[in-house]
Amino acid sequence: MRILVLGIDGHLGWPLALRLAKRGHEVIGIDNLSTRRFSEEVGSDSAFPLPQPQERVSEAKKHLGVDITFYVGDITNYGFFKDIVQRYKPDAIVHFAEQRSAPYSMIDMDHAVYTVINNEVSTLRVIQAVLEVDPTIHILKMGTMGEYGTPAFDIPESIYVEAIVNGKKDKIIVPRKAGSVYHWTKVHDTDFLLHFQELYGLTVTDIMQGPVYGTRTEEIVEETLRTRFDFDEVWGTVVNRYCVEAILGLPLTVYGKGGQTRGFISLEDSIQALTLLLENPPKQGEYRVANQFAEIYSVKKIAEFVKKAGEELGLNVEIGSYENPRVEAEEHYYNPERKVLPSLGFYPKKRLPEDVKIMIKDLLPYKTRLERFKHVILPKTKWRKPQYVKRVR
C-alpha cells in the first residue's frame, strides 16, 4: 500500500513509518516539527536526541534498508497538503498531525485557541483532500480514550449506542465527557469525521487509544532510529514521567489520590495495532471505532511498578503525593470494551510491569542530559486558573 503519515516526526509517527516501510509499504510523511518547538517552549526536549528529518530518513535507509519520503510542512496549508495527496494518491492517510498535549492546551487561553484551530482545521483539511482527490482513501485518525472521560457505564467500541432518554429509545452517539481542551478537540474530530462520513460514504477508522509507554519497537535497532520521548509535566505521559523521575531521584509525581485509571499500551503494541488496522481496513463507507489499549491500571499502581523496577536497578525511588493540577475524578469506575483489535489477531507483546525496567535501562545512559530538564517535571500547569475563579459566598 501507499500510506501517507501525517505527524511522521512524532512519538508514534516515526516508529509507524519504520514498521510500514519495513513491511514493504510505500511511506510518505509530513510534519511541521511543531512538537520540537513546543517542547523547547516549555523548557524541555526529547530524552533521546533527535536527528533532523533528512538524517532520520538516511539512518532508516542505512540500518533498515527502507526508503521513506519526509516533507516538512503544515497540512493546514491546504495548497501544500492537497498537492502531496494529489501527487501520491495514497491508499490510506494516517492522521497524527495534531497538537497532542492536554496540559499544553490548558496553559492559558491562547494555547487553548491554538489547539482548537490547529486540530480542527487539520482534520477538516484531511477530509477535504480525500473528498477532492479520492473519496475511497482510508482515513485512520488517532483519537483518545480520553474522549469518553470516566463514565459509570462500560465504554462501548462503537460510534452509536442505544439509549433511553425521557422514556424514549433511540440510537445516539456514545456520550463524551472530555477533560481538557485537547481532549475536546478529539471529540470534535470524531464529530466532523462522522458527519462527512455519513454525507459522502468516507471510510474511517477512529482509534480511541490509551496512554502509550515504552522506548523500543522491533525497528529501533540503533540510537539514531529512536523516536522522541517526552517526560516533562506538559508533554510527558505518566509512565514516561515516572521513569525519568526515578532516574533523577525525584519523588514519583502521583497526582491526588492516584486512583485515576486508564487503558495503557506499549509503543511496540501500539505500532502493531496501527499496522493491523491499516492492513485490514474497514469496508468501504464504514466508520470503524477501535479502542486501542492492552492493560488497565491506576496511576498509583504504575508508580509501584516503577519503584520496584528502579530499586531492582539500584535506584532509590520514592512515591510522592502532589496536589492534582487537573480537574478529574481521582477514584472511579473504568471498563472499556475491546473487540476489534483481537478480531484482527492483535495480541500484546509487552506488559507494563516488566517494560518499565527496560525503559529505565534505556534512559539511564542519558541521565546527564535529563538533569538539564529537572526543573520542568513537577506539575505547574493547572486546569483551574485562580484569576477566573469567582468566590462564592
Swiss-Prot record:
Its EC number is 3.13.1.1. It catalyses: sulfite + UDP-alpha-D-glucose + H(+) = UDP-alpha-D-6-sulfoquinovose + H2O. Its cofactor is NAD(+). Catalyzes the biosynthesis of UDP-sulfoquinovose by the transfer of sulfite to UDP-glucose. Important for the assembly of the S-layer N-glycans. The reaction probably occurs through an NAD(+)-dependent oxidation/dehydration/enolization/sulfite addition process. In vitro, in the absence of sulfite, UDP-D-glucose is converted via UDP-4-keto-D-glucose to UDP-D-glucose-5,6-ene. NAD(+) binds at residues 31-35, 74-75, 100, 118, 182, 186, 212. It comes from Sulfolobus acidocaldarius (strain ATCC 33909 / DSM 639 / JCM 8929 / NBRC 15157 / NCIMB 11770). Belongs to the NAD(P)-dependent epimerase/dehydratase family. Changing residue 180 to A: Decrease in activity. GO terms for molecular function: UDPsulfoquinovose synthase activity. Changing residue 182 to A: Loss of activity. This is UDP-sulfoquinovose synthase. InterPro entries: Epimerase_deHydtase (IPR001509), NAD(P)-bd_dom_sf (IPR036291), UDP-sulfoquinovose_synthase (IPR053578). The active site is at residues 144, 182, 186. Keywords: Hydrolase, NAD.
